[in-house]
Design a protein with these regions (language model features):
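N-terminal beta1-alpha1 cap of cysteine-dependent amidohydrolase-like domains
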Residues: 1-13, 18-183
C-alpha cells in the first residue's frame, strides 16, 4: 500500500503519474490502484488530472474532442472522475471546445486546460502556469497557492533559444553517413 509508506515520512503531497492509455490492459491495475487510493484518502485529499490529446484535423480545420470524451467515459466506468483535464493540442482550444469537454466529461470549464505544443520542452511549465494549473489544483485541494517566481526559468529558456555562442561538435562513428544512426 503506497500511501501507508509515504505517510510515515510526513509527506504532505504525493504526485503520482500513471502513464499509458486509459483503454490499454496494461494500465488497468494502476488505474484501479489510483481509484482505491483516492477512496482511502478521500476525494478532498486527492485530485485526478487527466492528460489527453485533442487531435487537430488540418483538412477540416477542426479539433476533435471525441477521443477525450471516450477516455473520460472509460475512467468514469472504472469509478474514476478526473478533477482537471489537460488537453494536449497543436492548436489553441476556444471556449466552445472547452465547454464541450466540460459538459461531456463532467468537469468545470475552468478545469479544462490547454497544453499547446511547444518548441522547447522546458517551455511546458510556463505554458501550464499560463493556464493556471497550479491554482486550479490548489483550489481543488483547498490549499493556498502563492504565485511562483519563474524569472530564472524564463531566463534559462531564453538562453536555450538564443545562445550567445555557436559550438561545432564532431560526431565520430562508423555509420555517420546514415542520417539517423546516432539520434
Amino acid at each position: 500500500r503506497f500511501h501507508r509508506n509515504y505517510t510515515t515520512e510526513e509527506t504532505e503531497i504525493a504526485i503520482i503519474e500513471v502513464g499509458g492509455t486509459v483503454g490499454d490492459i496494461e494500465s488497468q491495475p494502476f488505474l484501479e490502484a489510483i481509484r482505491q487510493f483516492q477512496h482511502e484518502v478521500g476525494r478532498e485529499n486527492a485530485i485526478l488530472i487527466h492528460v489527453t490529446l485533442i487531435p487537430y484535423l488540418k483538412a477540416s480545420g477542426e479539433l476533435k474532442t471525441k477521443p477525450t470524451q471516450a477516455s473520460v467515459k472509460d475512467l468514469q466506468g472504472m469509478g474514476i472522475q478526473p478533477d482537471i483535464i489537460v488537453c494536449r493540442s497543436e492548436q489553441p482550444l476556444d471556449e466552445h471546445i472547452k465547454g464541450k469537454i466540460s459538459l461531456f466529461c463532467n468537469v468545470p470549464q475552468d478545469h479544462v486546460l490547454q497544453n499547446l505544443d511547444v518548441d522547447v520542452l522546458y517551455e511546458a511549465p510556463l505554458a501550464m502556469e499560463k493556464e493556471h494549473l497550479a491554482q486550479v489544483a490548489c483550489q481543488c485541494l483547498k490549499l493556498e497557492c502563492p504565485k511562483p517566481d519563474l524569472s530564472d526559468w524564463e531566463e534559462m529558456i531564453d538562453a536555450w533559444k538564443h545562445p550567445l555562442h555557436q559550438v561545432s561538435i564532431a560526431l565520430v562513428g562508423k555509420y555517420t553517413a546514415l542520417h539517423d544512426a546516432y539520434i
